[in-house]
């Protein structure tokens, strides 16, 4: 009887921290892979134009509006990553697409894409965003586990806490990213 009760309450096989670190490593690897995808001239031209339109749009905003624009974009992506299991696939797609956009932007400016990717490691907002995304994808996995174990209340409480944390982190990252954008644009 006691053994069955312990089995029902068994925790997820690894700690939350380890799961976040695994998701963080996977996101970095997938983003890096995106910087090596083949790019044809038409795609490069179209994506490069879109990136420049976004930069131009942000350039015409004041600092707070630019921060809110960046924040809302990143938060929407991050919230989708909380969806059990689907969120991990979506998050990896976002990371692959980000790597691809980095590659196209780098090639447009005649800079080696891996160098641009690695240089992002110096940007604090890069790490804050990545940790937020890894936390959301991890929580999506833990939501699935909680639903499987029928621990709805605990899972909901944990999820709301993580949503609050990543929201604060992404707002901070957006302020830093906007500051970098205006300082070096």
Locate predicted features.
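Membrane-interface interhelical connector segments
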Residues: 40-63, 104-118
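Alpha-helical transmembrane segments of multipass membrane proteins
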Residues: 26-30, 77, 169, 173, ...
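Alpha-helical transmembrane segments of helical membrane proteins, especially in multi-pass transport
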Residues: 120-143
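Transmembrane alpha-helix/helix-exit interface in multi-pass inner-membrane proteins
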Residues: 35-42, 82-108
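Terminal transmembrane helical module of multi-pass membrane proteins
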Residues: 139-185
């Amino acid at each position: 009887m006691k053994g069955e009760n312990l089995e029902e309450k068994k925790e997820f096989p690894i700690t939350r921290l380890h799961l976040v670190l695994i998701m963080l490593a996977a996101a970095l690897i997938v983003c890096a892979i995106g910087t090596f995808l083949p790019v044809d001239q038409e795609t490069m031209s179209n994506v490069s134009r879109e990136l420049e339109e976004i930069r131009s749009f942000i350039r015409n905003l004041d600092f707070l509006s630019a921060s809110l624009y960046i924040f809302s974009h990143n938060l929407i992506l991050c919230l989708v990553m909380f969806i059990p299991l689907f969120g991990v696939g979506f998050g990896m797609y976002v990371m692959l697409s980000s790597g691809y956009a980095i590659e196209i932007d780098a090639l447009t400016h005649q800079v080696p894409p891996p160098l641009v990717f690695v240089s992002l490691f110096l940007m604090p907002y890069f790490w804050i965003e990545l940790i937020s995304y890894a936390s959301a994808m991890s929580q999506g996995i833990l939501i699935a586990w909680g639903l499987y174990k029928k621990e709805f209340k605990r899972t909901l409480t944990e999820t709301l806490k993580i949503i609050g944390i990543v929201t604060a982190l992404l707002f901070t990252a957006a302020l830093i990213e906007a500051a970098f954008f205006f300082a070096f644009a």
